[in-house]
Design a protein with these regions (language model features):
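Mid-domain alpha/beta scaffold segments of enzyme catalytic cores
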Residues: 1-245
Length: 245
């Protein structure tokens, strides 16, 4: 949203080795209350106001050399409120258009309905995100906090997108098959802090520095030397965001 995007740019500009991505998260597009079940372990409950994506505001923010992407944007179906689809779609397309205009990569948010929930389209969020990207996106990007299948991931790869994995890998074996299948040069490691801290930091507020635990787990799953995985993931980040460090 506008306030947090502005703050992210301020933090990035004040700290060497930090960059910012600016945009409007899909759950911020409708007025609602988001508790820990919705936002994830480690987050503080908050109320969204139903913000409209102001392209001029974000275009101005993106003039900073520290802004390296647009997002996170996409579809969040975790709520059963099927009426939110149209406003999420409108904000998503507007952010894709801005990314195209500025030639910046997209950070994609994709979340399926909770158990027993209903998708507003009858399809998975991954399918709907892919369909919109295929129609509108002229830039590449990353599908963050990836929790889809390898078959779904391949469709994103065909569009020039990568996927990223979080600390969930360290305690949920269900993702190991996907991690094993995804080529190392098409993935990233992330924390999604302050949420879902990896082992051995479970129960604590997640921090960006904990990403090393995700990298270690990827190396373990792929049976590769840690140094090789670290080197390739750094290359991937530099390639996607056009940064040097």
């Amino acid at each position: 949203k506008e306030t947090t995007s502005k703050k992210a740019v301020e933090i990035a500009e004040a700290n060497e080795g930090s960059w910012a991505i600016v945009g409007l998260h899909p759950i911020q597009t409708t007025p609602d209350f988001h508790d820990e079940e919705v936002i994830g372990e480690g987050g503080k409950p908050f109320a969204s106001k139903g913000e409209v994506f102001n392209k001029d505001f974000y275009r101005e923010l993106a003039k900073s050399k520290k802004v390296v992407g647009i997002g996170e944007c996409g579809f969040d179906y975790f709520h059963t409120n099927v009426d939110s689809y149209s406003v999420q779609e409108e904000a998503f397309i507007a952010q894709i258009e801005l990314a195209n205009e500025l030639n910046l990569p997209l950070m994609i948010h994709t979340r399926d309905p909770k158990m027993g929930g209903v998708s507003p389209t009858g399809r998975s969020a991954y399918e709907d995100v892919h369909q919109v990207l295929k129609q509108y996106a002229k830039v590449q990007g990353n599908v963050h906090f990836y929790a889809g299948t390898y078959e779904q991931a391949k469709k994103f790869f065909e569009l020039g997108f990568t996927v990223s994995f979080t600390g969930v890998l360290t305690f949920a074996k269900v993702y190991e098959e996907v991690v094993q299948a995804v080529p190392l040069d098409l993935m990233h490691a992330e924390t999604d802090s302050p949420y879902v801290s990896p082992v051995p930091h479970r129960g604590k507020r997640c921090e960006p520095g904990y990403v090393i635990e995700v990298v270690k787990k990827i190396a373990e799953i792929k049976a590769l030397p840690l140094e090789e995985v670290e080197e390739q993931l750094l290359k991937n980040a530099k390639r996607l965001y056009g940064v040097e460090f």
